[in-house]
């Protein structure tokens, strides 16, 4: 424990807080260009074919982002909006692509949680 005199001389250093989405650089979302769109498999107890994309963000940082929802229209050179939020069973995937924004279409025939997937309300 330092003495008061030592604290007067030196002071305390603030704790360094690590962010979960460093590539976003403090922004809620960032725009980027898909460099590769592919599928991958999740870690052990789960089994599926998950759709992911390598995205080069505007700052020049390249990240792996998950494409949520059923079906997508993304390909190389598509311009996408990337938000934070990891996918627990895909190692290294710490970002998600926003559906219904820029070149990404919303999910077709989506009834519930529509705003998350950029789906319009169905006409009766």
UniProtKB/Swiss-Prot annotation:
One of its GO terms (molecular function) is structural constituent of ribosome. The modification 3-methylthioaspartic acid is found at residue 89. Keywords: Methylation, Ribonucleoprotein, Ribosomal protein, RNA-binding, rRNA-binding, tRNA-binding. CDD domains: Ribosomal_S12 (cd03368). Belongs to the universal ribosomal protein uS12 family. With S4 and S5 plays an important role in translational accuracy. This is Small ribosomal subunit protein uS12. It comes from Micrococcus luteus.
């Amino acid at each position: 424990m330092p003495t008061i005199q030592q604290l007067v001389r030196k002071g305390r250093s603030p704790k360094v807080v690590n962010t979960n989405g460093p590539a976003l650089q403090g922004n809620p979302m960032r725009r980027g260009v898909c460099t590769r769109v592919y599928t991958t498999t999740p870690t052990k107890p789960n089994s599926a074919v998950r759709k992911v994309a390598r995205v080069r963000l505007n700052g020049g940082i390249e990240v792996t982002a998950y494409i949520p929802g059923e079906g997508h229209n993304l390909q190389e050179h598509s311009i996408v909006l990337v938000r934070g939020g990891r996918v627990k069973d895909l190692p290294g995937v710490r970002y998600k692509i926003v559906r219904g924004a820029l070149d990404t279409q919303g999910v077709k025939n989506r009834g519930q949680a529509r705003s998350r997937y950029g789906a319009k309300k169905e006409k009766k």
